Amino acid sequence: METKELLKKVRQLEIRTRGLVNQVFSGEYHSVFKGRGMSFSEVREYQIGDDVRTIDWNVTARFDHPFIKIFEEERELTVMLLVDVSGSQFFGSQGQMKRDIAVEISAILAFSAMKNNDKVGALLFSDQIEKFIPPRKGQSHALRIVRELISFEPKHSATSIKGALDYLNHVLKKRSIVFVISDFMDSAYETSLRIAGKRHDLIGIRLLDPRERELPRVGLVTFRDAETGAQRWVDTGDLKVAAAYLAYRRSVEEFRKATFIKAKLDSIDIRLDKPYMKPLVDFFRLRERRW
């Protein structure tokens, strides 16, 4: 992509997404995340009315009467965007590809973090770690992330959510807010997700094109796997073929849901045929009420 064209796209996306941040989203981000990080400060003697869950049992045993832990809010948070750039992200039947929506949502989250003076970083992944941008503050850094997301051309096309989470668990030591933006057309990442979810506040953002839910009955067509490049003829009118595809899609979706539920992690479903801001805002408002 030419530099002039790239800068134009970045500017257009910045105007659109920062408008959404200012008008709709930043309040939800601030309410849910700002000050949620807590760090240990000191201990003091237990007083009537204190939350018994904060009792420090080691100190209590040592002095033979109860002490509680005092925590302070961590005003500065770190937001990490794990963005799937594999081949399946270049699909879209609704005028925009999954990757386009992933870029816009990432921009909204990056600008929200910037507006709240938080650090933001990004990890772009396929079945390899394509690019890692360490978390930093500031407008220029948020714009750098947006530029990379718009212009980046991955070297690989397959998907490994496990690989991305393992890398995250290795490089990011401080507890962070982690968004995994993907269609989650993958498996065998449950252990890595559970570990990452214990270390970080992890939220999945699943992108779904409605055309992917079932095969359209259009007769004999050539299908190309966006991640492997393999091609084959498929009779979409064959009921057995349609049933097998539907069963596969259900198994992938059931695995994703069960994995997030078991790890006690939140996720958001974003359909490409509907505006993405409503499910995002609804989710954060629901989460704010839970706090």
Walk through the language-model features, giving the residues of each:
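A conditional alpha-helix N-cap/helix-loop micro-motif detector
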Residues: 103, 157-161, 249
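Active-site flanking residues adjacent to catalytic metal/cofactor-binding acidic residues
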Residues: 83, 182, 205
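Von Willebrand factor type A / integrin I
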Residues: 1-33, 42, 51, 170-174, ...
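Von Willebrand factor
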Residues: 141-176, 188, 209
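Short, electropositive alpha-helical surface patch
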Residues: 132-147, 258
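Well-ordered alpha-helical segments embedded in enzymatic catalytic cores
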Residues: 105, 163-167, 252
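Short, flexible loop segments at the rims of nucleotide/cofactor-binding pockets, characterized by
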Residues: 58, 154-158, 180-182
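An amphipathic, basic-hydrophobic helix/alpha-beta surface used to engage anionic
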Residues: 1-135, 177-179, 187, 259
